[in-house]
Amino acid sequence: MGQFTVVSLGLLAMFLSLSGAKGDNCPASWISRNGVCNKLFPDRKTWLEAEKRTWKWSDRTSTNYFSWNQGEPNNVQDNENCVHLWAPSGYLKWNDEPCASLHPFICQYKL
């Protein structure tokens, strides 16, 4: 198996948009799309729990893509150091929030 990248998402809709054909190389219950395997884990975890030991992207590149909701990140009470996809934006925009917040998450790895 390749390195895992954990993406904390607060949504099921994003997972459903990944509904490509099931690949022969992905484990059962995983979905294959564009050369990667994806799986939604509905149990809720904090950002730190969900991405433990997988903090960096699997290819070690930094992101140059940002999709903050208007007025974000605002770091309310100097306690919002993690990000999730914001439901009121249709899960298209990011919102910063405390890292102890619980959300479903998706794991992904390259085939």
Curated annotation (Swiss-Prot):
Function: Mannose-binding lectin which recognizes specific carbohydrate structures and agglutinates a variety of animal cells by binding to cell-surface glycoproteins and glycolipids. May be a calcium-dependent lectin.
Domain C-type lectin: 33-108
Signal peptide: 1-23
Subcellular location, record wording: Secreted
InterPro entries documented for this protein: C-type_lectin-like, C-type_lectin-like/link_sf, C-type_lectin/snaclec_domain, C-type_lectin_CS, CTDL_fold
Family, as annotated: Belongs to the true venom lectin family.
Cysteines joined through disulfide linkages: 26-37, 82-99
Binding site for Ca(2+): 80, 95-96
Coiled-coil parts of chain: none
Organism per entry: Pseudoferania polylepis (Macleay's water snake)
Motif extent (Mannose-binding): 72-74
MF terms (GO), sorted A to Z: carbohydrate binding; metal ion binding; toxin activity
GO cellular component: extracellular region
Domain of life of the native organism: Eukaryota
Main subcellular localisation: secreted
Name used for this protein in its record: C-type lectin lectoxin-Enh2
Tissues expressed in: Expressed by the venom gland.
Lineage: Eukaryota, Metazoa, Chordata, Craniata, Vertebrata
Pfam family, one: Lectin_C
